[in-house]
Amino acid sequence: LVTNNHIRGNPYEQGCPTRRILDRIGDKWTVLIVGALEEDTLRFSELRRRIEGISQKMLTQTLRGLEEDGLVTRTVTAEVPVRVEYRLTDAGQSLRIPLKALEDWSIDHLGQVLDAQAAHQSKDAPSS
């Protein structure tokens, strides 16, 4: 739906482009990359060190998607060796606040969620 030169989506409608955006920003690697870039411009290798457990392939794919969606800027400098840096765009910076809230929620509720998972697993375990 277009109103006043602005596109307004409805993520509850099948085929709405907002679903793709939600898929991107709801991804765990996106949350961690945006958090890592919150205050810094970082090189690929620095991001990889900061985000433990992310593979080179996944970091590359996620950064490309974030760049495609206008959330991250990739800058290549003409140095030897070539220097490639990533930083959040204004849109990426505006995403940091809601993603930080999700990060904080996951930390604050970790014990409760782990307890619920353990209870669920023990309920589903076969009795001896």
Over which residues does each language-model region extend?
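N-terminal helix-turn-helix DNA-binding core of bacterial DNA-binding proteins
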Residues: 12-58, 78-79, 85-87, 93
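Basic amphipathic alpha-helical segments that dock to polyanions
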Residues: 59, 63-66
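Conserved beta-strand edge residues that scaffold enzyme active sites
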Residues: 79-80, 116
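Amphipathic alpha-helical dimerization/coiled-coil segments
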Residues: 1-5, 13, 93-128
